Amino acid sequence: MIYQPRQTIWVSQKVFPTSQGDGGFLKGCLPISKEVNRKKESEVEGACWAPVNGDGHHFTKINYLYTF
């Protein structure tokens, strides 16, 4: 008889692009270059629901917990 204790594996993906069909961007929230759009940062951030990093991409932190 072989005894195998339960193993737990924690997988963390700190930066994972959101998948909304094409390009991983939320609908209506495409990246806007700072040279083209010179609005205040507060106005640009208020236009999208998800937080935007410095590159204009929307990211979601996803953690997975697997138990075997």
Swiss-Prot record:
Q: Which domain of life is it from?
A: Eukaryota
* GO terms (BP aspect): axon regeneration; regulation of neuron differentiation; regulation of transforming growth factor beta receptor signaling pathway
The name of this protein is Neuronal regeneration-related protein
Q: What's the source species for this entry?
A: Gallus gallus (Chicken)
